[in-house]
Amino acid sequence: ADNPDNFLDLSVQGELKSGDFYIDGGVSSQFISGLLFALPLLQGDSRIFIEGNLQSSGYLDLTLCALKNYGIDVQKEGNVLYVKGNQRYLNHDSYIEGDYSQAAFFEVANYLGSGVDIIGLNKESLQGDKVITEFLQQLKDASPDETLIFDGGNCPDIIPVFALAC
């Protein structure tokens, strides 16, 4: 009743402090990636403990690669990430490669008979979603009565659109 615009009144206050962070790896790698971008800028060292099985590990690999490219040192030992504090991001020109998550829509459209030219994708990319090309090739190569099993644990973003091809 106090909020005629139907917006949630939410205020988050406080300061992110370095230290130990325990993150459930089965929920989303985005929480880990977010911490990895922020923690190097803090005063002290930090550790991220990934509990359970890490889903979407390919996305975490992309984050670690991006951090390295911009001069941030993160060490990974097992399920623990070590992040030194007081680091600075390096400024340099970068090429942003094509996004396999978005390209998956066009890859599936082509599989279903469209003729879309897809350019700008790095075939050597670390993106887990590039597996869409392998998944679609397996569908093409399969016999009509063959049962196929696809593991989308490391590429959950493409599974809904991939389902259209099945």
Over which residues does each language-model region extend?
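Structural preference for solvent-exposed beta-strand-turn elements
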Residues: 1-166
